[in-house]
Amino acid sequence: MSDDTNDAPEAPKTPAPLDPVAVVLLDHLATLPQDKSAAPDDVARAYAEIRRKPSDGRDLYKRYQRAVKEQAIHLARAGRIEILRRGEPVNPDDFKGVWRMRLKRS
């Protein structure tokens, strides 16, 4: 008797759904002119407005700053966006200080 488990075709890989912060980040960057970039605080504010409840304070966006950075790193590693320092793309695994982001240029 032969084992046919290796002959079965592989199921097509479906990309994992994006994190809601990543969706807002990509949507925000898509609205910018091609020569512009966004600060992480801009994206955190946009996401905070979606999540806002009447009892939330005006600094709600600060809760989401870390999530924005994590998703930006993830998207940069995947080649979907660029993380910029002084207007130049940087390694998403090794950057510090003030940074911005933009959609990956083709």
Predicted segments, located by residue:
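Phospho-regulated, low-complexity intrinsically disordered regions of nuclear gene-regulatory
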Residues: S2, T14-P15, A67-E70, R77-S106
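A generic structural signal for short
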Residues: T14, H28, D59-Y61
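Short Gly/charged-rich anion-binding patches and loops
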Residues: V24, E70-Q71
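Amphipathic alpha-helical interaction surfaces
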Residues: T31, K53, H74, A78-E82
